Amino acid sequence: MDFNNCGFIDPQAQLAGALAKQDIRQFVAALDSGALADLQDDRHTSIYEKALSTPGCRDFIEACIDHGSQVNYINKKLDKAAISYAADSRDPGNLAALLKYRPGNKVQVDRKYGQLTPLNSLAKNLTDENAPDVYSCMQLLLDYGASPNIVDQGEFTPLHHVLRKSKVKAGKKELIQLFLDHPELDIDSYRNGEVRRLLQAQFPELKLPEERHTGPEIDIQTLQRTLRDGDETLFEQQFAEYLQNLKGGADNQLNAHQEEYFGLLQESIKRGRQRAFDVILSTGMDINSRPGRANEANLVETAVIYGNWQALERLLKEPNLRLTPDSKLLNAVIGRLDEPPYDGSSHQRCFELLINSDRVDINEADSGRLVPLFFAVKYRNTSAMQKLLKNGAYIGSKSAFGTLPIKDMPPEVLEEHFDSCITTNGERPGDQNFEIIIDYKNLMRQERDSGLNQLQDEMAPIAFIAESKEMRHLLQHPLISSFLFLKWHRLSVIFYLNFLIYSLFTASIITYTLLKFHESDQRALTAFFGLLSWLGISYLILRECIQWIMSPVRYFWSITNIMEVALITLSIFTCMESSFDKETQRVLAVFTILLVSMEFCLLVGSLPVLSISTHMLMLREVSNSFLKSFTLYSIFVLTFSLCFYILFGKSVEEDQSKSATPCPPLGKKEGKDEEQGFNTFTKPIEAVIKTIVMLTGEFDAGSIQFTSIYTYLIFLLFVIFMTIVLFNLLNGLAVSDTQVIKAQAELNGAICRTNVLSRYEQVLTGHGRAGFLLGNHLFRSICQRLMNIYPNYLSLRQISVLPNDGNKVLIPMSDPFEMRTLKKASFQQLPLSAAVPQKKLLDPPLRLLPCCCSLLTGKCSQMSGRVVKRALEVIDQKNAAEQRRKQEQINDSRLKLIEYKLEQLIQLVQDRK
């Protein structure tokens, strides 16, 4: 129902409408009807506020006050008073209505909103157009008692704001005279007397008040104000005077001023006062002191946040600077790299200073274990990613949630950086000493304060690349391929030793099982293979116990580990003299042989032979694809099984009762009944098995008794839909999978090797839960020797390959970049004498054992020919790109020269005319 049409008008709506129409009579009538001018709407705005801030509403303001609105009304949401709303209107009438004398009501004319008093607000918004109205408003406020000396957040008084309005010409002198006529005006105490200097410069004819002398003593507040004013010359003078006054004090008083210096330093950094910063820093104050508030940034963090690269550069050169691990300087600056440089500040320059500084850890992590590379990827800053990677950012740092920084990184950025890690020694490609240098600085974390025996999971980033469909092609990059070669070179001892022992165990337990169940007369041979089987079982138990101790939580999450536990259990039952009957023992032996063979196939598939790993991968992928597809289509198998059971599952006795033929002999009858029971679907389980057999095309249709047209129809549907369509579909999926695997055989081989190495490394590291095993120095040293490449094997985190000398791999023996002396952070130079070897050939992981790589891949110290060929291709591509870039630069310079000559020619023609 519309109450407005019935004469019931909402007083509040009438009040708003009257103000919009500037109808004072309806406005007063609405107030008389009970409307509230102070009532706020959904936007937290009242009619009273609108009247105060709208020019020409003097009568409306008086009406509101007469009906109960307060002259000191405050909007609680905005903390804004009525006087500030009236000043925003810049209407003298509105302001006069509010300041009208009312007994008992004193307006607070100096109340601030947004750090501005009404006088400051009027002066700050002064223009040529509103100068007369602003003059009248200021006169009203000053006559009412407003102070002309209250400053805003920049320590500007109202008169100072007026003097700074250089574009305002009309009425400016009258406004200044209005302030000068005020008896309490102070033009000397704020901003070091800048108001007096401006008055003398702009209006020298005006008579100024006498200069106020505040005394010779200068305090911290004075220095703070001078810093904010930007007069660094004056600050240097005042600070020198301030220090002179402090020299007469006690030592404890001098120490007490260190915190005050810290505040001055922070202020100089925030405002970019470099001269003041150097002056304060020259006092020798402790730059590592923390402020009083715990969450407040220190000096270096302040310089990074405000982009003051000059102060940051000065602080990083301080020998006494100590950076705490929780500084997170790079993380703080990366989020601000998109901000444009302003007034000398540049977050980009700060970022470059930090990544090039020896004092800043490029892999520093915050509380969530997020490293700077995480933030560069998060903010999609490609330039920051490239610079971090170039300076050795580790790509395998895991966050608190187990994610890696390269998770959302564009693959092309990572590939481009990997290309830059493949360089040469500068010799000609045909020379004998031509070297391909491969740098692994992003694959091996450089720990500053970690112990030498700390184990690292170096396979984590490569395992992630292998799992990512967008990045797994990078496994064929020479950087990753060569790294996998080195890791396999270290871990191959464990793999081949495990493979050898398990092969002996497989042969022993299968031979022992055959001899045992065939009751061979070779008792000694049976006992010998039984002993070998027990030794193999003992080895498996020891191996699985070590894995469980190292990683008890994750152990049972692996299907392979569960299968190995089942294998150990069944092997024990097979080898021991149990009280089981013969049939149970045979079943246990059968399952034991199956599990032993499956485990052996998995080990064979992990061999570094491309043909073997490809075929094992095809077997695994086709099996997984078949299981997934058949699980979905199994509903049709069950459906047809039930149909056949219902149609053909008549009992043999029922068929015989209907048959007039005599019964066969008893033995033949039982065999025939069993055969007919399977072929005639007499039991549900047998019906399911028979249906699965028929799915392969083995129908045995002659033994099926078709009794009606419907039985023929159901059987025909099964043949068409299941045998022809579904079975060929499954075959097609298998063929498709094998074709894909063959097309990516080399990539799949790299994935298999990555998975094997990652699994072995995870077992050895134990994910940090290895307990007393890794606490043992000897065990930890052995694991580190077999597993970790850096720092005990590659101190320089790079290798050299000789493509013209049999692809030999050389290991640098010295570190010119990372092994620095403590004095002046200088470099430790490589020895130049030819008698001192700088590099060595790749050697076996354990000197007592031969290199296991040579069993299948040739000599130990030789890199794969495919890897070397790809590395040379990368170098050729980089050289070609560099040549194209240089040619483009030459073309650009030629075009600029042509343009310059044409401009000269045109100018010459114009001059002749």
Swiss-Prot record:
Keyword Transmembrane: yes
Protein name (Swiss-Prot/TrEMBL): Transient receptor potential cation channel protein painless
Organism: Drosophila melanogaster
Key words, A-Z: ANK repeat, Ion channel, Ion transport, Membrane, Repeat, Sensory transduction, Transmembrane, Transmembrane helix, Transport
Intervals, Extracellular compartment: 512-523, 577-586, 650-708
GO molecular function: calcium channel activity; calcium-activated cation channel activity; monoatomic ion channel activity; transmembrane transporter activity
Topology term for the membrane: Multi-pass membrane protein
Region of interest: Disordered: 656-675
Compartments in which it is found: Membrane
